[in-house]
C-alpha cells in the first residue's frame, strides 16, 4: 500500500480541485477555514471539550488545537496558521512536522487575535467557513461570504466520495474500534458494570471519553432498548442477560462507528435472535451494489425483519408482506438502516442529490432514515439493522385490530433483554462492497 504521505499528497490535489471549482462557481478568491475556538461553560472559566470544525480537519489532521486558520485558493499551497502561544497554564501543541506538513505551509500564530495581520489586505471576496461568524466580521469578511450555503453544499456533497487517504484513515479507525469492542466484550463476560466496560473500551482504543467520535452506548439488559443510551451505570446488574455496545474510534479526524450485541447465555431465544439478525445483516450487505438508492436497502431490511418476527413467532398469522405494508415491523426497528460515515459520524449530505444541494427527504413511512442518495464508488456507509423491544412503541399496538397478531407473551419475555443492533462500516467500490469491520474478523 502507498504510504500515508503519498496518499495525503493526492488527497490535497483532490481538495484543491474541488476548491478551484467551487470558487469559480461562486466567483470568490479563496476560503478561510477556521478550526474553531474554545467556549467556556456559562458563568465559569472552564471550557467545553474542543471539537474541531470538520471542514478544517478535511484538509489537515489537526483535531485538538483551537484558533488555527487555513487559507486555500485551489492554486497555491494551502497556508495553515497554527496556534502556538507562549502559555505556562496549558499545554501547547508543538508546530507539527508529520507526514502531511510537506503539502501545507505551516506558520506559527502566537496570538489568537493575530490572524488579521497575516491575511491578505483585500478580503471582501474571501469566504469564511467556521463556527464563529463574529470573528469573520471582525476580520473584514463580507456577511454574505460567511458560511455561504452554496459553497458549503458543494463541499458537503463531494465529501461523500472518499479519497484513498480518507479510506486509509477510516480503516485505521476501524482497527482501534475493533480492539475496543473485543476488550469491552471481555469486560462484559467478567461481570463488569457499564461504567467499567466503558473504561476498558477507552483503554483498548487509546481514547479519552472526549476523543471518541460520539458518546459510547454501553447498554446492559433492558438499557439496550434505549437507542442512544449513554448513562453508564456504576453497578453491574444482579443478572446479566445481554450487552449492546455501539462505540467507535477516530484516526486523523475520521470516524469508525460499530455496534455489536451479545447474549450472556448462548442457548436462549434472545441469543438465537441475535444470530439471525447478524445473518440477515450480512445477507443484506451481500446484495449491495453501486447504482442503487440507499432507501431500497432500508425497505429491504424491513422485509427481513418481518421474516424474523415470523420465524421467532413474535408476530403470527400474518404474511411478511402484510407486516411490512401495515408497518408492524416499525416498532421493532424505529431507526434507519444506517448513514454516511466520514469526518463526522452522521456524515453530511446524506439527502443531497447533487452539488447544488437538491434535497430528497426520507420516505414519510421511515422518517428517521439518514440517507436517500444513490450509493456510488468511494462512499462509506453504516449498515446497522436492529430489533428492539421498546414499550412506548409497542404500547399503541396492544389495542386495535392488529393486536391479536403480536405474541405479547413472547415479546414481554424479550423486553428484559432490551434489543439488538449489529453495525458494520462498508465502502462502496465499482464492482464490490468492502466490509471494513468484518475484514478485521469482528464477529
Curated annotation (Swiss-Prot):
Splits dipeptides with a prolyl residue in the C-terminal position. Belongs to the peptidase M24B family. Bacterial-type prolidase subfamily. Keywords: Dipeptidase, Hydrolase, Manganese, Metal-binding, Metalloprotease, Protease. GO terms for molecular function: aminopeptidase activity; metal ion binding; metalloexopeptidase activity; phosphoric triester hydrolase activity; proline dipeptidase activity. It catalyses: Xaa-L-Pro dipeptide + H2O = an L-alpha-amino acid + L-proline. GO terms for biological process: proteolysis. The keyword Protease applies. Its EC number is 3.4.13.9. One of its GO terms (cellular component) is cytosol. It comes from the Bacteria. This is Xaa-Pro dipeptidase. SUPFAM superfamilies: Creatinase/aminopeptidase. Mn(2+) 1 binds at residues 257, 339, 384, 423. InterPro entries: Creatin/AminoP/Spt16_N, Creatinase/aminopeptidase-like, PepQ_N, Pept_M24, Peptidase_M24B_aminopep-P_CS, X-Pro_dipept-like, X_Pro_dipept. PANTHER family: XAA-PRO AMINOPEPTIDASE 3, XAA-PRO DIPEPTIDASE. It comes from Klebsiella pneumoniae (strain 342). Its cofactor is Mn(2+). Mn(2+) 2 binds at residues 246, 257, 423. The lineage of its organism: Bacteria, Pseudomonadati, Pseudomonadota, Gammaproteobacteria, Enterobacterales. Binds 2 manganese ions per subunit.
Amino acid at each position: 500500500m502507498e504510504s500515508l504521505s503519498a496518499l495525503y499528497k493526492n488527497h490535497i490535489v483532490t481538495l484543491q480541485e474541488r476548491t478551484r471549482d467551487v470558487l469559480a462557481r461562486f466567483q470568490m478568491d479563496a476560503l478561510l477555514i477556521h478550526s474553531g475556538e474554545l467556549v467556556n461553560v456559562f458563568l465559569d472559566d472552564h471550557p467545553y471539550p474542543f471539537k474541531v470544525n470538520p471542514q478544517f480537519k478535511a484538509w489537515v489532521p489537526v483535531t485538538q488545537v483551537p484558533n488555527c486558520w487555513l487559507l486555500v485558493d485551489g492554486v497555491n499551497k494551502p497556508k495553515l496558521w497554527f496556534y502556538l502561544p507562549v502559555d505556562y497554564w496549558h499545554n501547547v501543541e508543538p508546530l507539527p512536522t508529520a507526514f502531511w506538513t510537506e503539502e501545507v505551509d505551516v506558520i506559527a500564530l502566537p496570538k489568537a487575535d493575530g490572524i488579521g495581520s497575516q491575511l491578505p489586505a483585500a478580503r471582501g471576496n474571501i469566504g469564511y467557513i467556521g463556527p464563529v461568524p463574529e470573528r469573520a466580521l471582525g476580520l473584514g469578511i463580507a456577511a454574505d461570504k460567511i458560511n455561504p450555503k452554496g459553497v458549503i453544499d458543494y463541499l458537503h456533497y463531494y465529501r461523500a466520495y472518499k479519497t484513498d487517504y480518507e479510506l486509509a484513515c477510516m480503516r485505521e479507525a476501524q482497527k482501534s474500534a475493533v480492539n475496543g469492542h473485543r476488550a469491552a466484550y471481555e469486560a462484559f463476560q467478567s461481570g463488569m458494570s457499564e461504567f467499567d466496560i466503558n473504561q476498558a473500551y477507552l483503554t483498548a482504543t487509546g481514547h479519552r471519553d472526549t476523543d471518541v467520535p460520539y458518546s459510547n452506548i454501553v447498554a446492559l439488559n433492558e438499557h439496550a432498548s434505549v437507542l442512544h443510551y449513554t448513562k453508564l451505570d456504576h453497578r453491574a446488574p444482579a443478572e446479566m442477560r445481554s450487552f449492546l455496545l455501539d462505540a467507535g474510534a477516530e484516526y486523523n479526524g475520521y470516524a469508525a462507528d460499530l455496534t455489536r450485541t451479545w447474549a450472556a447465555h448462548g442457548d436462549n431465544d434472545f441469543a438465537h435472535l441475535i444470530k439471525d439478525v447478524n445473518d440477515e445483516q450480512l445477507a443484506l450487505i451481500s446484495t449491495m451494489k453501486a447504482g442503487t438508492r440507499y432507501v431500497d436497502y432500508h425497505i429491504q431490511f424491513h422485509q427481513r425483519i418481518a421474516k424474523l418476527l415470523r420465524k421467532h413467532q413474535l408476530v403470527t398469522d400474518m404474511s411478511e408482506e402484510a407486516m411490512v405494508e401495515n408497518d408492524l415491523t416499525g416498532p421493532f426497528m424505529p431507526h434507519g438502516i444506517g448513514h454516511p460515515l466520514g469526518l463526522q459520524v452522521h456524515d453530511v449530505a446524506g439527502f443531497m442529490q447533487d452539488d447544488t444541494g437538491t434535497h430528497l427527504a426520507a420516505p414519510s413511512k421511515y422518517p428517521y432514515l439518514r440517507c436517500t442518495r444513490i450509493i456510488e464508488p468511494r462512499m462509506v456507509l453504516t449498515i446497522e439493522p436492529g430489533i428492539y423491544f421498546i414499550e412506548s412503541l409497542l404500547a399503541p399496538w396492544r389495542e386495535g385490530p392488529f393486536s391479536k397478531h403480536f405474541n405479547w407473551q413472547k415479546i414481554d419475555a424479550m423486553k428484559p433483554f432490551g434489543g439488538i443492533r449489529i453495525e458494520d462500516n462498508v465502502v462502496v467500490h465499482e464492482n464490490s462492497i468492502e466490509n471494513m469491520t468484518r475484514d478485521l474478523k469482528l464477529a
